[in-house]
Amino acid sequence: MNQMWGSIEQYNTVVWHWPIAVYLFLAGLSAGAIISAIIIKWMKGNESSPWDGIIKAGALIAPLTIGAGLLLLIFDLTRPLHFWKLLIFYNFSSVMTLGVLALFAYFPVVLIFLLGVFKKELCDEGPFGFLAPLANIAYSMARPLEIVTFVLAIGVGAYTGFLLSAMYSYPLLNTPILPLLFLASGISAGISGNLLIGLLFFGKSTKGENVGYLHGLDFKVILFEAFLLFILFVGMYYQGGSTAEVAKAALTTGGLASLFWLGVAGMGLALPVVLNVALPHGIKHSSGFVMLNALIVLAGVMALRFYILYAGQTFVG
């Protein structure tokens, strides 16, 4: 197999380019943000207003990132003005159709969650008083709405992996581990996004115990991601034949191998773990370090999306 250097746009086997990688990142970030926000909301002491800053952060991040991701996806289509057809003509054997249906249900419920959390700012004192009935639903039916939102968010997070795993002729993508890996990394990104935005913009209402809980949860999720990546490549190697060659090439060939070892394994997985193990308790639980760690994790998750998308399409056996 020839070594490949330079821009990753040069590889003629690549049909999905960087906008898809960014979309996959934003969709996972949205799902992870709302999942971790709901987890915090369900904890004792966080069930009612005034809301913790992490809940506020998740309520903002979830609809904004999925909205931005969908716009990016639409404009990346060869014929973006025909996107509406996906909403009318369903093919239930298509992963794309099932994903669109999940997103079609997910987007409204995260908007209602946002209205419930920011009811005072948006409806009572803001310009969106006409949306107060929806905000009231978020209050009166909080737990059922949150359960539905939580389940849909898991579906959206996993769907980003299913979308790629349906590409049967690409060994690195066509694996059942990918949906779980993308869900886990999306949750990690969502936790980091909530910690970053919560501490930056809602610091006064962000409880230290909630920050500590999510920071510790993210550490566990990162270890789980590393385990999934290990299983992914070991499994491919022991399948033998061209699949083993693809696994070897993806880890050793050109700029994509560098992206994996430096961006995914190094920055995204090893660095947060080492910092959290090596640094004194006072430093690693400070707001400054938590925000820095969140930025590192977000960059690592973005690197993972780019790596899987491009390496999966480049190394095909």
From Swiss-Prot:
InterPro entries: Electron_transfer_protein, NrfD-like. Its main location: membrane. The keyword Iron does not apply. It is found in: Cell inner membrane. Gene3D superfamilies: Formate dehydrogenase/DMSO reductase domain. Belongs to the NrfD family. Could possibly serve as the membrane anchor of the enzyme. Component of the phosphorylative electron transport system with polysulfide as the terminal acceptor. This is Polysulfide reductase chain C.
